[in-house]
Amino acid sequence: MTSYPSSIADSFEDIKLRTITYPQDDFVSWYLPAAEVAAVFARGHLPYITLPDIRDVRPRIAVILAQEKHPARDEKDYSLHPDYASAIVASGGFPVFIAYDKVVEQLANTKPDGVLLIGGCFNSPRDWYLEPPVEDKDKRAQAYLQMLDYARQNHLPTLGICAGEQIIGGSLGAKLRRDINRDCDVAQSHKQGGYVLAHKVKVLPDTLLAQVVKKSELLVNTAHNEAIDNLHLGQCRIAALADDDTVEAIEPLAPWHKFVLGVQWHPERLLKLGDEASRQIFKTFVKVAADEL
C-alpha cells in the first residue's frame, strides 16, 4: 500500500513505472507512456510515480524522468535508465519520479529529502554556451531548473550526474562547451560508453568530492559531448579534472546544503560494477538526505 507523503492524498494518483526494452537498446528500461501521465494532470490530479514492489520509506529522492522514443507511439515515453533507480535503492533511498508538468506542485506534495539530476540528451539554455546553439532550453531542461530552484529554496542535498552536473553549473553562471570530442582521437574521446573505464580524473583537495571518496585519483567512465568550461566557472569551483583538463566535477562556492555535487561521469553505472568511490558518492548523498551525517 502506498504511503503518501502529505495529508492531501486525494490529489495524487499512484502510478508505477513499468519495464520495456526499446528497439535501440540492449537493456531493460523503466518507462511510462506520456499520455498516461498527461491524463492524470487532465483530471486535475498529480502523479505519484514510483517503482513497483518497493516500500515507500525515507529518505525520498526526487528524480526528473528522462524521455525515449518508442516506434509505436507518436509522443516520447517518460523513461529511466535502471541504474539510477538501483543506485538510490541500494544506498537506502526511495526514488520518486517527477514528470515535466507542474514540477513545483509535484515536489511540494511529495516532499523529497534530496534531488538527483540525472544525465541525458536535452537542450540546456542557449545563453549558457560559449558557442550558442540554435535551440533554446526544452521542457525537460525547464523541469530540471525548476527542481534545482526547489532544492535551493528548501536547502536539499543535490547530486548532479553528467548533464545534471552541467545544469548545476549553468544555473550558477558557468559556461558550457558544446563539442569537447571534436578535436579528440578515439582514445581521448569523452564518449566511450557508460561501463567502460575510460580515463583517470584528479580529485582536487579540500573539496566535498575528496571528503566523500577519500582518494586523489579515480578511474571513471565517460559518455558526454558537452562540458563546463574551465575559464568560465561562474559561482562554482572545480572538484575534479581529467588529464586533458576537462572539468569532471564541480561544487558551488556557496552551497545551499552541505552536500551539493556535480560529476561528469556516471557513478550509478560504476556502482553496478562494484566501484567503491561510486558507492561512497551515493551512500553519502542518501545518508545526508536522511539526516544521518
What are these regions (language model features)?
Residues T222:
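Short, basic/aromatic recognition patches
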Residues T2-L159, G170, R177, N181-V212, ...:
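N-terminal beta1-alpha1 cap of cysteine-dependent amidohydrolase-like domains
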